[in-house]
Amino acid sequence: MRLAFALYKYFPFGGLARDFVRIANICHQKGHSVDVYVMEWNGEFNPNYNVHLLPCENWSNHGKVASFHQQLNEKLLAEDYDVVIGFNKIPGVDIYYAADPCYIDRFEKITFAQTLNPRFRFYAGAEEAVFGPNSKTICLMISDKQTVLFKKHYGISDDRLVMLPPGIDINRRRPDNAGEIRNKLRTKYQFNEQDNLVLMVGSGFKTKGVDRALAALAALPKTLRATTHLLVLGEDNLKRYQQLAAKKGVKANAHFMGGRSDVADFLLACDLLLHPARKDNTGTVILEAMVAGLPMLVTEVCGYAKHVLESKAGEVLMSPFSQQSLNEKLPEMLVADKKMWIKSALDYADSEDLYSMPEKAVDAIERIGEELSHAD
């Protein structure tokens, strides 16, 4: 089949981008042609894809996205693709991979003034075009919580929803030489075995709750704080958060490592995953920590927080978020014996399907492609 994938921006350290690549790679391996339409592509081009850059100039983000939608529609009309897959909410796609949360749910009450706001009208309209009753788009869902919200707001029928399991890379599972990798990384960055290493992973530091983590780090008892280090992997305004760390008196304890390709090694080298996100459709890093045997402390708003509760591989901060609760729970977990959390995480990783999302997504793409060809 001739497949077209559309997403606004590609950068190699984004969760959505990683999901796209894994799905597109399987499509290519199965003999399908892969065309990709983007506004921006950061990093090396994949030789297996035909990448089409659609530059969009506008003073506003929603204006750029609107330009992308228009250009994309013109390109698609000129081509004869069997299936068009959107990784953002794009009107007219055959399939939408639902990586983003429900937009209109963030508004408790939609006011008349909001309906006049061009930004609101654009994004609400794009979401309606994908999930609304007049749409034929099939939605690949990765979050139970978000599925409930989309049903609530749009009444989307079950026959337009495909629930996918998580898609953790099997290579992230704890290897036999985990101890060796742990020691090597700690030595490389001059940490000793007695140091408590707390890991955060993800770009978009405000959304991921890095400020919350810095506040909790600063609140640790002095002796515990002296041996505790927060390692933040991801891309954002590093200078701003380094200044925040200095303001809170934990500059020496907070290490901003940037976007990285060796996250798996850090999952093995650290003692705790901290993910106090303000919102997260899934929270893929939660399950990456799970399969690596790393205990975790996460907020309930994350889609994958349910797996922490089911596995008993860590602790969940219930909503509404309380900084005081985080400040109390972090030192408790740092000084606790972590053996049971580690065992629970690895047992859960062995018994649950946390891995097959890309394969199941491709199965859905192929099935929908067959149905569309018969409909023609």
PLM region descriptions:
Residues A17-R22, N196-A219:
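A conserved mid-protein helix/loop that constitutes part of the nucleotide-sugar donor-binding site
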Residues F120, A124, E128-R182:
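Donor nucleotide-sugar binding/catalytic pocket of nucleotide-sugar-dependent glycosyltransferases
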Residues L224, H229-K251:
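Short, structured helix-loop element that forms part of the nucleotide-activated donor/catalytic region
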Residues G259, R278:
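Aromatic "clamp/platform" in nucleotide-sugar-dependent glycosyltransferases that forms part
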Residues L273-L274:
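A short hydrophobic beta-strand element within the catalytic core of glycosyltransferases
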Residues P295-T299:
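Short hydrophobic beta-strand element within catalytic cores of glycosyltransferases
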Residues K338-E366:
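A charged, aromatic-enriched C-terminal amphipathic alpha-helix characteristic of glycosyltransferases
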